[in-house]
C-alpha cells in the first residue's frame, strides 16, 4: 500500500507524543552544529536545521531543510563531509538504534523530501528553480496569512544560492523581480508568497 505524505505526517503526529517523552532530549542554539554521532538519530521537536556538505574549494552545498517531526542524523547519509547546522534554536529527541524501526514513516518522509528538493534544484530556468524552492519552503515552514503564505523560516540569499547552485546576486535580483511583479511581499525579513498570482 502506498501512503501519501499527509497520511504519513498524520501518523507521525499521532505517535510522536507517545514516543518522544521516552527519549533523552537536547537543546541546541542557532548556528550550532549537531554532534557527528553514528549511533543515534535525532527527531526534531522544535526548530529547523539544514544538512550540508562542501566542495574542495570550500563552497557550501545545502542538502536539505528539516523541521518538527523530521528524523535526521549522520547514519542517513553517506556524503562526506556532512554537517547538520541549526538555523534556529532546536530541540531534538535522541533516538537510539533499537527504536529506528518504529520511525519508518519519518524515514519515508526524509527520503521523499530529499527527492523533492533534488528535483527542484535541477529545474530550469533559474527563476522557476527559485520560485519552486520558495513554494517548497512555504509548504514546510509556512502558514497562511491574509496576503498569502508566510515563510516563517529566515533563509538568507546566500543560503538560497547554496541550495540552488547559483549566486547570491542572482537570488537577490530574482527576489526583487518577484516582488516587482507582485508575486511576493517582504514582511520583517520574512517572505510572503502570493501563490495565486504566479503561473508556472
Where are these regions (language model features)?
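Cyclic nucleotide-binding regulatory module and flanking cytosolic helices
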Residues: 1-30, 37-40, 67-72, 77
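Glycine- and acidic-residue-biased ligand/ion/polar-headgroup-sensing regions
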Residues: 39-56, 67-69
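A structural signal for short hydrophobic beta-strand segments in well-ordered beta-sheet cores
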Residues: 42, 84, 183-184
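Cyclic-nucleotide recognition modules
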Residues: 61-116
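Phosphate-/nucleic-acid-contacting segments
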Residues: 141-200
Amino acid at each position: 500500500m502506498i501512503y501519501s505524505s499527509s497520511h504519513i505526517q498524520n501518523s507521525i503526529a499521532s505517535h510522536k507524543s507517545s514516543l518522544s517523552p521516552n527519549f533523552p532530549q537536547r537543546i541546541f542554539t542557532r548556528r550550532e552544529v549537531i554532534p557527528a554521532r553514528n549511533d543515534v538519530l535525532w527527531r526534531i521537536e522544535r526548530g529547523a536545521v539544514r544538512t550540508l556538505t562542501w566542495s574542495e574549494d570550500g563552497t557550501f552545498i545545502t542538502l536539505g531543510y528539516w523541521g518538527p517531526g523530521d528524523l535526521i542524523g549522520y547514519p542517513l547519509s553517506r556524503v562526506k563531509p556532512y554537517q547538520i547546522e541549526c538555523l534556529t534554536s532546536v530541540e531534538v529527541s535522541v533516538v537510539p538504534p533499537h527504536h529506528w524501526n518504529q520511525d519508518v514513516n519519518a524515514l519515508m518522509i526524509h527520503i521523499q523530501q530529499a527527492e523533492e528538493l533534488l528535483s527542484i534544484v535541477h529545474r530550469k530556468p533559474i527563476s522557476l528553480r527559485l520560485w519552486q524552492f520558495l513554494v517548497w519552503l512555504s509548504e514546510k515552514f509556512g502558514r497562511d496569512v491574509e496576503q498569502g503564505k508566510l515563510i516563517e523560516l529566515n533563509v538568507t540569499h546566500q543560503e538560497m544560492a547554496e541550495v540552488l547552485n547559483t549566486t547570491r546576486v542572482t537570488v537577490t535580483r530574482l527576489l526583487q523581480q518577484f516582488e516587482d511583479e507582485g508575486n511576493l511581499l517582504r514582511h520583517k525579513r520574512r517572505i510572503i508568497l502570493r501563490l495565486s498570482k504566479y503561473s508556472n
